[in-house]
Each structure stands twice: as structure tokens, then as C-alpha cells.
């Protein structure tokens, strides 16, 4: 009987915690459903939960869809990007060297090659330092890592090798799956939605190398 009571108490506490989290997300969803934007803090909190794997996939799908249907506000983009950077794997580099990036948001449905990646390689051959941040294809035909893998480039190098490549060769790839591990919780939902989401905008804003300049397409 005592064991049963302890189990019941633990279960009750667990359900209470789950309900609090669900209620918070439901409030944000209700706000979006009524065509109201979220504040910077609300969005940051929501995406922090996402990157910790605390959001149910069905709820996450609804959340991403509602955000897209409303149109993204500056506070929503800023809050989400701040949460993503905060959850990212840290990377340090030589800040005395200017580093740039050429990047697109993806999701154009044109089924073309990943042009930004090829452009970045060309720029590196001309003496520029390019920190290419990217992922496998989610809402596009090809992603940056897809192109580089086909070219024989190792997209999962260590931080030290990545740093050396950036300094010595002028080009290094920062694989989103390595530096933004919390994205794995959103990946299946993004794949199922098969459309661009706010994550397409966040990618160019969250380069782990903290680039000095960026050409965004």
C-alpha cells in the first residue's frame, strides 16, 4: 500500500510538471492562433524547450505552422536565434582574421544545386576566409553537407581540424548537426512538414564561427 501511495504521489507530481509545460505552450499557441505575435522572451523560452527535447512533436508541428502562417516578427526571430545560439556547441577562432559566409535560407523548391556552398569554395580560392554553416537537405533538394559529401569533404571534422582548415585553407564547414545538437528534436517534424519554417531563417543567423560579414540569399 505504501509503495502504491509513493508511486501515485510521484506520478501526480510528474503530471503536474507536464501540465505546466503543456499549458505554457498552449497559451503561446492560442496567442498565435489569434494572430498575435509572441514576445522575444516567449519565443526564446519556447525554443529553449524545443532544443531540450521537451516539446511533443505534434505540438511542435502546430507551433511551427502557426508561426509561419502569422509571418515572423523581429522579436520572434531574435528570441528563437538567441535560444539556438545559447544551446549551440561553442567554437573559438582567431578573431584577428575577418571571416565571412555565403548562405541561403533554403526551401525554394527549385531543386537546384546548393549554390551558396560552391560560391563559398570559390571565394576561399580567391583568398577569403569562409566559414560555411549548413545542414543536410530538409526543405530543399540539396543541402550544404550533401554537396560537400559528394565532393569527398568530411563534414564531421573535429573543432581543431575545422579551426585549422579555416585558418590554413580559407574554408571550413560547420555542420549544424554537430554544433546545434538540439536541432535533432525538431528534424523529424521539419521533414514531415516538408516546407520551410523559421528554422530556415535561423540557420544563417546562428553560425558557430560568429562571422564578420555574410552574403544572404
Identify what each model region corresponds to.
Residues 104-109, 134-140, 179:
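Acidic, glycine-rich active-site loops and adjacent beta-strand->loop/helix elements
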Residues 64, 113-169:
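A glycine-rich phosphate/pyrophosphate-binding beta-strand-loop-alpha-helix module
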Residues 6, 13-24:
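Short, Lys/Arg-enriched N-terminal segments with co-localized hydrophobic residues
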Residues 161-217:
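Phosphate/diphosphate-binding glycine-rich loops and adjacent basic-rich segments that engage nucleotide
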Residues 22-111, 126, 130:
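Acidic, glycine/proline-rich low-complexity segments that act as flexible tails and inter-domain linkers
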Residues 101, 130-134, 155-158, 173-175, ...:
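General beta-strand structural signal in soluble alpha/beta enzymes
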Amino acid at each position: 500500500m505504501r509503495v502504491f501511495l509513493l508511486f501515485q504521489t510521484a506520478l501526480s507530481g510528474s503530471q503536474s510538471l507536464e501540465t505546466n509545460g503543456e499549458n505554457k505552450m498552449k497559451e503561446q499557441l492560442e496567442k498565435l492562433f489569434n494572430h498575435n505575435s509572441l514576445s522575444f522572451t516567449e519565443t526564446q523560452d519556447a525554443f529553449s524547450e524545443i532544443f531540450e527535447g521537451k516539446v511533443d512533436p505534434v505540438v511542435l508541428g502546430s507551433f511551427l505552422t502557426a508561426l509561419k502562417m502569422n509571418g515572423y516578427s523581429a522579436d520572434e526571430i531574435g528570441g528563437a536565434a538567441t535560444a539556438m545560439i545559447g544551446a549551440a556547441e561553442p567554437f573559438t577562432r582567431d578573431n584577428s582574421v575577418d571571416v565571412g559566409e555565403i548562405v541561403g535560407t533554403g526551401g525554394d523548391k527549385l531543386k537546384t544545386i546548393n549554390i551558396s556552398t560552391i560560391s563559398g569554395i570559390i571565394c576561399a580560392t580567391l583568398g577569403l576566409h569562409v566559414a560555411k554553416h549548413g545542414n543536410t537537405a530538409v526543405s530543399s533538394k540539396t543541402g550544404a553537407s550533401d554537396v560537400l559529401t559528394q565532393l569527398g569533404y568530411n563534414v564531421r571534422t573535429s573543432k581543431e581540424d575545422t579551426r585549422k582548415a579555416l585558418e590554413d585553407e580559407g574554408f571550413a564547414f560547420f555542420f549544424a548537426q554537430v554544433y546545434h545538437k538540439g536541432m535533432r528534436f525538431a528534424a523529424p517534424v521539419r521533414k514531415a512538414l516538408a516546407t520551410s519554417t523559421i528554422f530556415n531563417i535561423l540557420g544563417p543567423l546562428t553560425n558557430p564561427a560568429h562571422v564578420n560579414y555574410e552574403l544572404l540569399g
